[in-house]
Amino acid sequence: MEFRQPNATALSDPLNWNVAAEALKGSHLEEVKKMVKDYRKGTVQLGGETLTIGQVAAVASGGPTVELSEEARGGVKASSDWVMESMNRDTDTYGITTGFGSSSRRRTDQGAALQKELIRYLNAGIFATGNEDDDRSNTLPRPATRAAMLIRVNTLLQGYSGIRFEILEAITTLLNCKITPLLPLRGTITASGDLVPLSYIAGFLIGRPNSRSVGPSGEILTALEAFKLAGVSSFFELRPKEGLALVNGTAVGSALASTVLYDANILVVFSEVASAMFAEVMQGKPEFTDHLTHKLKHHPGQIEAAAIMEHILDGSSYVKEALHLHKIDPLQKPKQDRYALRTSPQWLGPQIEVIRAATKMIEREINSVNDNPLIDVSRNKAIHGGNFQGTPIGVAMDNTRLALASIGKLMFAQFTELVNDFYNNGLPSNLSGGRNPSLDYGLKGAEVAMASYCSELQFLANPVTNHVESASQHNQDVNSLGLISSRTTAEAVVILKLMSTTYLVALCQAFDLRHLEEILKKAVNEVVSHTAKSVLAIEPFRKHDDILGVVNREYVFSYVDDPSSLTNPLMQKLRHVLFDKALAEPEGETDTVFRKIGAFEAELKFLLPKEVERVRTEYENGTFNVANRIKKCRSYPLYRFVRNELETRLLTGEDVRSPGEDFDKVFRAISQGKLIDPLFECLKEWNGAPISIC
């Protein structure tokens, strides 16, 4: 992505709207795939204008090596030389000869001492917690600090900041040696940049005695120990403007925003696929994805969400079976699915657009020059402005957080339908997988946890940026709160990962229960058919389609826990069918028919429990001969990931294993990025367009 344009382009697009629009071409999914590709590259080349969210997230995680473009050296040196020459000319420039902020009326000719004092007074953060067991809770997480170092170097490489190239090389060396200065978690309003946290990077570079860092193995190092380990020869004596160049920028807020958006983009794609999986396992009607509906609404996010769901559902074995079931009994479920399923593209579409727009906004920010003053060597002047105002970060993060909360709300609505036997089209209550529902409450605890997660997520959706307080003696009277909003959004991402984990395990549980349902129903059909033939060997029961129709229409989990009970729904409905047929017979044959009904029920009462137990045992041992339909679906890679790669299985009350143990496995894998490949595999055949309606 290019941000500094040649003159011809600048003249044709002076407001940069065309460049911004160009960046939105293509699908969101392709953009996310590119983001992941950037993340997985082994090297990040910094030149000042082409840094991506994926690269920032990668460096944050400690992955690639960072290299500086030699082409940037000349511009960086020119701005640094200009500062020194301006001092010699007695040019009055903010932060070089003046005090800072509301104290800019003050003057000094001791430029180096001024920078040293700047770093000293900005080292105002608090690391202490008063709790020895939690001694890092007031420290910015290491990944965010690494990302901030990268972004600050990228900004300074553009040659408008008056800093030596050697300082940028030193920061890069520290990054590549996995040495990370400790920064305070709080204390910045991201206006005049992230002054307080960035001052600790500057303090580390000049060897301040209070500076500490985390080494490659997690050990705490002093600045001296770290420099020796990295092979950096000595601390820096800051020249005029260099301290200000290091601290006066939005790097910390945009760093955390970048890592947040990397995860958020993946989670929104997951929510699209998960909604399609929900439709599959709920025996939903796929017409909600029909392209005409979404084409007429015009919103690109909605159209893409529907197209992705349509792709997952196209050819799905569950969808084919559901169509068959709907034909057998059109009144078994509502004509239209509920909103959490039917309007999921309309719900997710705006969230996709918001997160995509936020991603572009932050990507522009991390490639921007955002300090003050800016050194314009070509015009031989310093320009005093306010690019340090991190409003794009605060606004983008507030919007992202609201989108994440909406995604979580949809996920919760789908989850609560899935575990409720009044809504889930025949699955057991709480998705209980055991033999005795009175001793197996399945995901009941998980539903409570999901309510908790969702409530917290909705609370976090409240905006941060409207809580501005005036600072620096009313010099910073409006400020972005960019890092605070980024931190809050990072919390929201964690909670949405918890929800995604719980929901994905629940979907896999539901798919397995559909499989068990199919095996059990087949076995019950065979028992009822055999018994009807052997016991009801009189007219009108030689053709027993009506009897099997009852079996096919009745939800198997409504009776399978106690199949021998004469009061279970299956037995009652079979009895009604037989009574109706018996009463329709000539008067002389009625008594014989009624005697057959009793024998029929007695035989079922004897055979069904044995057959149900045999099927359950075979299912548990994996010796059944009915394939799981999920293997014939495009959503299978996610199921395989949870069941095979992470070694989870159907949860039952008979197993000592708790749901939380499986949730831990899945959450850890999601946090490690292992969800990405199976997620993309679900969509590997999608051509980026809806199925044609012509």
UniProtKB/Swiss-Prot annotation:
Enzyme Commission no: 4.3.1.24
Post-translational modification: Contains an active site 4-methylidene-imidazol-5-one (MIO), which is formed autocatalytically by cyclization and dehydration of residues Ala-Ser-Gly.
Keyword Secreted part of the UniProt annotation: no
Residues in cross-link 5-imidazolinone (Ala-Gly): A191-G193
Annotated binding of (E)-cinnamate, by residue: N248, Q336, R342, N372, K444, N475
Top-rank EC class of the record's enzyme: lyase
Tagged with keyword Secreted: no
Keyword set, alphabetical order: Cytoplasm, Lyase, Phenylalanine catabolism, Phenylpropanoid metabolism
Modification 2,3-didehydroalanine (Ser) occurs at: S192
GO CC terms, sorted: cytoplasm
pH profile of the protein: Optimum pH is 8.7-8.9.
Role according to the record: This is a key enzyme of plant metabolism catalyzing the first reaction in the biosynthesis from L-phenylalanine of a wide variety of natural products based on the phenylpropane skeleton.
Subunit structure: Homotetramer.
NCBIfam families: phe_am_lyase
The protein, known as: Phenylalanine ammonia-lyase 3
